[in-house]
């Protein structure tokens, strides 16, 4: 079993490049199923285990997938007749596999997708996806752990008001509606940059989508879509993690590919703490020294503070003075990293959906285990400043969302190794 071992105390300096966004590439890969004419080529694709999983799902659905890892590119040819069923053996590994349902319904008029797995954080229900498909005219029923969807008269444009701005549901409905008859309106839509990237991709394929990035998205259905070449946007969560690595070690690093507009809620909090940020055309420079100020954070749907940055920000707040409160409103069960931080001598108490951090914690190296993807990164960040040696296990979580994080940190001056036991 792999582990990452960190000896804390080194300031990070230098330059590091952000990979393509995991949360953009997965829906965009599934959207490639919409192209009945010509293959699509996606570039700036991060080399992640989740990308391999979704590629396997697409192959099962009868798409030809060529993964050119050395070029960070994937070519998807979905011009043949697609299979209707995404089986449990793949879908169980990753929740994003549910995103094949929209494209399959759009292309075939029917789909069978196993109920998803792959995430330890809360229940992440799929009711909003189902609500959207039913509004578009599909009949849905659940049986033997599968979702059966059938739109025997085809999908028809409609108005859909989401109860919550679910990212996955917004993406799935956009994809289904892109080939539906007539106009679809999604109200209370998710506004993440990854939604905008998906809409841009489908528009490049010949789609007619407006309003992505706002509350209301309009999709005018078209007859068919064709493959194109598209570059995936940079990963704002990786960028944020690297900015925090610079700040937590009181270092000075340039994060190439970090886009301020994609992570405004994070950078404003960092500035409030006294972290110095310099915004350049192709990235963000982060510098920090001395004591940082306490701030409170509350996770919210975009453009609020991202839940995917909560645990990393908590690591940074442990090194700041004063009283801090971290409130998680997006997912239940997302404080599992707190118990691991406590093993490192962190002063944190959880009360319901809030974690209270008292004073500056004198972090000490310890053996800890990653409980989810972002917790893995957060524990590594804490290890960068802990006194002594920190060992982080359960790295399969980390590999789902970060490409060579330990290698990047080492290149910036961290004393860090990945060891295969």
UniProtKB/Swiss-Prot annotation:
Predominant location category: cytoplasm
One Pfam family here: EPSP_synthase
Binding site for phosphoenolpyruvate: 22-23
The organism's place on the tree of life at top rank: Bacteria
Gene Ontology MF annotations: UDP-N-acetylglucosamine 1-carboxyvinyltransferase activity
Catalysed reaction, written as an equation: phosphoenolpyruvate + UDP-N-acetyl-alpha-D-glucosamine = UDP-N-acetyl-3-O-(1-carboxyvinyl)-alpha-D-glucosamine + phosphate
EC top class, as a word: transferase
UniProt-listed GO biological process terms: cell division; cell wall organization; peptidoglycan biosynthetic process; regulation of cell shape; UDP-N-acetylgalactosamine biosynthetic process
EC number: 2.5.1.7
Associated pathway: Cell wall biogenesis; peptidoglycan biosynthesis
A Gene Ontology term for the protein's cellular component: cytoplasm
InterPro entries: Enolpyruvate_Tfrase_dom, Enolpyruvate_Tfrase_sf, MurA_subfamily, RNA3'P_cycl/enolpyr_Trfase_a/b, UDP_GlcNAc_COvinyl_MurA
Active site: 119
Family in the record: Belongs to the EPSP synthase family. MurA subfamily.
Its biological purpose: Cell wall formation. Adds enolpyruvyl to UDP-N-acetylglucosamine.
Record-given protein name: UDP-N-acetylglucosamine 1-carboxyvinyltransferase 1
Species of origin: Staphylococcus aureus (strain MRSA252)
Source lineage: Bacteria, Bacillati, Bacillota, Bacilli, Bacillales
């Amino acid at each position: 079993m792999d582990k990452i071992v960190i000896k804390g105390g080194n300031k990070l300096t230098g330059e590091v490049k952000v990979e393509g966004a995991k949360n953009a590439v997965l829906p965009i890969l599934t959207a490639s199923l919409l192209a009945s004419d010509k293959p699509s080529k996606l570039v700036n694709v991060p080399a992640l285990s989740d990308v391999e999983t979704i590629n396997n799902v697409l192959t099962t659905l009868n798409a030809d997938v060529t993964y050119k890892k050395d070029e960070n590119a994937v070519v998807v040819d979905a011009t043949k007749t697609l299979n209707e069923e995404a089986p449990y053996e793949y879908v169980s590994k990753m929740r994003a596999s549910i995103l094949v349902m929209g494209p399959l319904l759009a292309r075939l008029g029917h789909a069978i997708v196993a109920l998803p797995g792959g995430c330890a954080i809360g229940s992440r229900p799929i009711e909003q996806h189902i609500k959207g498909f039913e509004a578009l005219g599909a009949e849905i029923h659940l049986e033997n752990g599968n979702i059966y969807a059938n739109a025997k008269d085809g999908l028809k444009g409609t108005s859909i008001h989401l109860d919550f701005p679910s990212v996955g549901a917004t993406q799935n409905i956009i994809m289904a509606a892109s080939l539906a008859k007539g106009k679809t309106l999604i109200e209370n839509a998710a506004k993440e940059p990854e939604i905008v990237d998906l809409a841009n991709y489908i528009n490049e394929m010949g789609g007619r989508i407006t309003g992505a990035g706002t509350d209301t998205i309009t999709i005018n259905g078209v007859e068919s879509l064709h493959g194109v070449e598209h570059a995936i946007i940079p990963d704002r969560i990786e960028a944020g993690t690297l900015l925090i690595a610079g700040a937590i070690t009181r270092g000075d690093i340039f994060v190439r590919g970090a886009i301020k507009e994609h992570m405004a809620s994070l950078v404003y909090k960092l500035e409030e703490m006294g972290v110095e940020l310099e915004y350049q055309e192709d990235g963000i420079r982060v510098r920090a020294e001395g004591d940082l100020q306490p701030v409170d954070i509350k996770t919210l749907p975009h453009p609020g503070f991202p839940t995917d940055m909560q645990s990393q920000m908590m690591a940074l707040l442990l090194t700041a003075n004063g009283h801090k409160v971290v409130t998680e409103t997006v997912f239940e069960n997302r404080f599992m990293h707190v118990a691991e931080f406590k093993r490192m001598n962190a002063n944190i108490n959880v009360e319901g959906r809030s974690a209270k951090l008292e004073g500056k914690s004198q972090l000490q190296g310890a053996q800890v285990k990653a409980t989810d993807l972002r917790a893995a990164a957060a524990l590594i960040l804490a290890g960068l400043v802990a006194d002594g040696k920190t060992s982080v296990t359960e790295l399969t979580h980390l590999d789902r969302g970060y490409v060579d994080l330990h290698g990047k940190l080492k290149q910036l001056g961290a004393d860090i190794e990945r060891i295969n036991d």
